[in-house]
Swiss-Prot record:
Lineage start: Bacteria, Pseudomonadati, Pseudomonadota, Gammaproteobacteria, Pseudomonadales
Chain's role: Provides the cells with the ability to utilize trehalose at high osmolarity by splitting it into glucose molecules that can subsequently be taken up by the phosphotransferase-mediated uptake system.
Family named by the database record: Belongs to the glycosyl hydrolase 37 family.
Enzyme class: hydrolase
Alphabetized UniProt keyword annotations: Glycosidase, Hydrolase, Periplasm, Signal
Entry binding sites for substrate: 160, 167-168, 204, 213-215, 285-287, 318, 518
Annotated gene: treA
GO CC annotations, alphabetized: periplasmic space
Gene3D superfamilies named among the record's database cross-references: 1.50.10.10
Any Pfam family hit: Trehalase
Keyword match Signal: yes
Protein name: Periplasmic trehalase
The species this protein was found in: Pseudomonas aeruginosa (strain ATCC 15692 / DSM 22644 / CIP 104116 / JCM 14847 / LMG 12228 / 1C / PRS 101 / PAO1)
Gene Ontology biological-process annotations: cellular catabolic process; cellular hyperosmotic response; trehalose catabolic process
Amino acid sequence: MPDRTALPRAMLAAWVLLLLAACSQGPAPTPPASWGWQDASGERAIAPDEAYPELFQAVQENRLFSDQKHFVDALPLREPARIRADYLRERERPGFDLRAFVGRNFEESGSVETAPPEAGADLASHISDLWPALTRHYEQVPAHSSLLPLPKPYVVPGGRFREVYYWDSYFTMLGLAESGQHQRVRDMLDNFAYLIDTYGHIPNGNRSYYLSRSQPPFFAYMVDLQARREGDAAYRRYLPQLQKEYAYWMEGSAGLRPNEARLHVVKLADGSLLNRYWDNRDTPRQESFLEDRATAARAPQRPAGEVYRDLRAGAESGWDFSSRWLDDGRELASIRTTAIVPVDLNALLYHLERIIAKACASSALKACEQGYGARAEKRRQAIEDHLWHPAGYYADYDWQRRRPIERINAASLFPLFTGLASAERAGRTADSVAAQLLRPGGLATTTRASGQQWDEPNGWAPLQWVAVQGLRAYGRDALAEDIGRRFLAQVQQVYDREGKLVEKYDISGNQGGGGGGEYPLQDGFGWSNGVTLQLLRLYGPGAGR
């Protein structure tokens, strides 16, 4: 089953230049114009591992910083080409001090700090107080920064996450709306529209090293959120960007034969077109360089580039990482994200197709409405045909082995969240979730404890919200409320004890924040704040009055 994703000649040529430069004692030529990601004006955004590859590798290999993300977020104080040339020359001198060189040439970035709650502040009040601390505005950024400018203010998650993230932001925006911060919701939506217009897609985050991938496509849901305030005018305004995002996810579909894949698109044996996660690069992630190299080294039977691509695709999924993507369910080196057709991604793309059809209808574009409506129906049927497990739940699909994955996970509820599930299958999925994923602190992510952060025992705010909304949409209000109240109690317990909200929670009954993964637990925290406010509206003190 071929995976038709050969690198273009320009990229191969760029890699040759990089290898030649790495072997030289002097500065290499400036990377060609084809290298890096061009924006709409033709300017390039070049990631740190491309701008000064030898220095980048030396810093990461020598672990100058405990977090590999730290250096790629640092600001070069001079032209990268000059820094690179000086490094290649100076590193040959006796007594060369790498740390001192970095200190002279880069300004380090700090973490996003949030203040403890004021005495007596309840959970909702504290979250409202956090929004200003998490808000950033970089309409212009210093030259050569890895940060990508955005025209309007935005809210970051917090901690080591100093930039805006795509799918995080939808759940953050839910909280902003609940706090009455409607202008900030519009600002963030406009920023994402700007990213689509500038780069052709919404990157993982607004960093140059994130441009080679996206994240779960929630832009249409952001437009829905804005439409609650201004009606169909929002759909008409953002129709061009909705269509551009759709084109990004469907690029490569033309000419595919059955059982082939290209970029994000997979054509199944029956001719159905579905999607997978993907990344345009097959190198270690810059922000997790050593970790990715170590992972690839544990799979000597696989080409390293294949492992790197699957790690990057796992990062695009937002579930980085999870037994969901692992062939053996335990070892990260067995990751095969690009071989899997994920149920959540395809449910979200179904919603995107439906929203484009709605926007076209509002714009009196009949052919457009009918075309996207037909695409949505074809996708819905393909999901029902292939992404359903006979045990009674929606499941991911292994397109290479032509069978559904034998593991339920929280993504099984996305077809309910997006409204594509039949009533009968929604009910069976709800029963399976109640039997297998319900924990003392809310909804489990998976049923496996692999040591990865998107596995047992962690519960994540966005997945709680998807579950609650999906179950409510199909009349399973009691189960939705049970999940929502359990998670709220978990958040409240951590807040009462530690005075903060965190990225993820241990929902096994330990009443603490979550663990696992590649970095320490982060607090702030954008999507936990947003979902908590929405759950308080539904199930908190005084809800429904």
